[in-house]
């Protein structure tokens, strides 16, 4: 345990099964509730907690040392922290990275996010693995507060959290109005030799793409931009008619938090766009929405997939890729219609990971080909989307 932590106020994590963990507050004072999940990634803690897909979730990071490199503005995947809370084992006393702008605990405090450190994250992860993701609460006290009082309060809060099933959180995290995106990938040799994100040459865009924001990560937009996409990002509830009126070369459906089934507005829009023959690509929640639009069903997973080391098999090539994953729901392969085929499966549990339409230019993937954090083994899926748009252009659609 870091020598810094004992000087911090007490904090308590309580689970719905009655488990209580004692630790120290590393964020804002107060309380938070959410679904407690674990992420096995060794790096990328800032990208993880700023991923909108973690809205209403308390994230447990299994790697013991979190905060080593601090945080900076460039690595955030959205405009703020979306995780409901953070659980870690050890907060280093010092950060060590030339890009660091602030320590993790200061970042959490400034954002008003509750965090806890100093607990046995291995024990917590085993509970979540064996019993499944469950509701939880963190109560971060002030100087003088005791564990018994904080624990009782945390257990009361857990009972009030409704769980993730049935929650439409895409409406919560989506942009309020459309915007243009022109930022590309990170360039170590940017202007004047200074590292910076590249900017799309708008005088020569290759594809006009409309991106639905259900909680989109910035690195997804960057990877699309890098391939010549002139992006218009639209709110989650934008109708298919509005999107089709823009005459896009392709439509992208983003990642996002919560249960896909309540997103009836998005399911209806996706169905109409796919039926119109517009090349369509979905990731994560977007993948689930496309599955529902095809007529399939989704199911709640026991503890989901959260990490950067998940092996996935591409059934078209036979190749295995290591992927970044972050989802608690999945498309039920047994409910797929005849015109949709499975393209990828998880080698951890056999769950469905990718789909392709036999009669339409539409593909989707459950994991995160943009990584951030994680490997880029399946970044070729972005290229497949470009191929679909190229083919549609040649056909004059």
From Swiss-Prot:
Its EC number is 6.3.5.5. Belongs to the CarA family. Residues 1-204 are annotated as: CPSase. HAMAP family: CPSase_S_chain (MF_01209). One of its GO terms (molecular function) is ATP binding. Pathway: Amino-acid biosynthesis; L-arginine biosynthesis; carbamoyl phosphate from bicarbonate: step 1/1; Pyrimidine metabolism; UMP biosynthesis via de novo pathway; (S)-dihydroorotate from bicarbonate: step 1/3. Composed of two chains; the small (or glutamine) chain promotes the hydrolysis of glutamine to ammonia, which is used by the large (or ammonia) chain to synthesize carbamoyl phosphate. Tetramer of heterodimers (alpha,beta)4. The active site is at residues 284, 368, 370. Transmembrane segments: none annotated. The keyword ATP-binding applies. It catalyses: hydrogencarbonate + L-glutamine + 2 ATP + H2O = carbamoyl phosphate + L-glutamate + 2 ADP + phosphate + 2 H(+). Small subunit of the glutamine-dependent carbamoyl phosphate synthetase (CPSase). CPSase catalyzes the formation of carbamoyl phosphate from the ammonia moiety of glutamine, carbonate, and phosphate donated by ATP, constituting the first step of 2 biosynthetic pathways, one leading to arginine and/or urea and the other to pyrimidine nucleotides. The small subunit (glutamine amidotransferase) binds and cleaves glutamine to supply the large subunit with the substrate ammonia. The gene is carA. Pfam families: CPSase_sm_chain, GATase. It is an enzyme of class 6 (ligase). Keywords: Amino-acid biosynthesis, Arginine biosynthesis, ATP-binding, Glutamine amidotransferase, Ligase, Nucleotide-binding, Pyrimidine biosynthesis. Signal peptide: none annotated. L-glutamine binds at residues 53, 256, 258, 285, 288, 326, 328-329. Residues 208-395 form the Glutamine amidotransferase type-1 domain. This is Carbamoyl phosphate synthase small chain. InterPro entries: Anth_synth/Amidotransfase, CarbamoylP_synth_ssu, CarbamoylP_synth_ssu_N, CarbP_synth_ssu_N_sf, Class_I_gatase-like, CPSase_GATase1, GATASE. GO terms for biological process: 'de novo' pyrimidine nucleobase biosynthetic process; 'de novo' UMP biosynthetic process; glutamine metabolic process; L-arginine biosynthetic process. It comes from Polynucleobacter asymbioticus (strain DSM 18221 / CIP 109841 / QLW-P1DMWA-1).
């Amino acid at each position: 345990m870091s020598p810094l932590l004992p000087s911090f106020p007490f904090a308590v994590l309580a689970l719905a099964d009655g488990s209580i963990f004692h630790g120290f507050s590393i964020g804002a004072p107060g309380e938070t509730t959410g679904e407690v999940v674990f992420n096995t990634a060794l790096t990328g803690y800032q990208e993880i907690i700023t991923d909108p897909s973690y809205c209403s979730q308390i994230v447990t990071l299994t790697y013991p040392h979190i905060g080593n490199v601090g945080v900076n503005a460039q690595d955030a995947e959205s405009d703020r922290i979306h995780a409901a809370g953070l659980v870690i084992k050890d907060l280093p006393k010092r950060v060590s990275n030339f890009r660091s702008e602030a320590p993790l605990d200061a970042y959490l405090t400034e954002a008003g996010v509750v965090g806890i450190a100093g607990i046995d994250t291995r024990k917590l992860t085993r509970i979540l693995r064996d019993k499944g993701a469950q509701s939880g609460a963190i109560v971060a006290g002030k100087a003088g507060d005791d564990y018994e009082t904080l624990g009782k309060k945390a257990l009361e809060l857990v009972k009030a959290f409704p769980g993730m099933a049935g929650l439409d959180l895409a409406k919560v995290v989506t942009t309020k109005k459309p915007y243009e995106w022109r930022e590309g990938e990170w360039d170590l040799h940017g202007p004047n030799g200074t590292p910076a994100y590249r900017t799309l040459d708008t005088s020569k865009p290759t594809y006009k793409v409309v991106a639905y924001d259900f909680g989109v990560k910035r690195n997804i937009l960057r990877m699309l931009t890098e391939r010549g996409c002139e992006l218009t990002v639209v709110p989650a509830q934008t109708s298919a008619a509005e999107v089709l009126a823009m005459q896009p070369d392709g439509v992208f459906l983003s990642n996002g938090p919560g249960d896909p089934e309540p997103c009836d507005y998005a399911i209806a829009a996706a169905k109409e766009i796919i039926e119109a023959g517009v090349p369509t690509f979905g990731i994560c929640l977007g993948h689930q929405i496309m599955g529902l639009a095809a007529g399939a069903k989704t199911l709640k997973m026991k503890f989901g997939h959260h990490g950067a080391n998940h092996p996935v098999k591409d059934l078209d090539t036979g190749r295995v890729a290591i992927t970044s994953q972050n989802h608690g729901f999945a498309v039920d392969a047994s409910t797929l219609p005849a015109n949709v085929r499975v393209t990828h499966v998880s080698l951890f549990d056999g769950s469905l990971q990718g789909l392709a339409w036999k009669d339409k230019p539409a593909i989707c993937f459950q994991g995160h080909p943009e990584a951030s954090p994680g490997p880029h083994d399946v970044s070729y899926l972005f290229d497949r989307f470009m191929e679909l748009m190229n083919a549609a252009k040649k056909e004059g659609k």
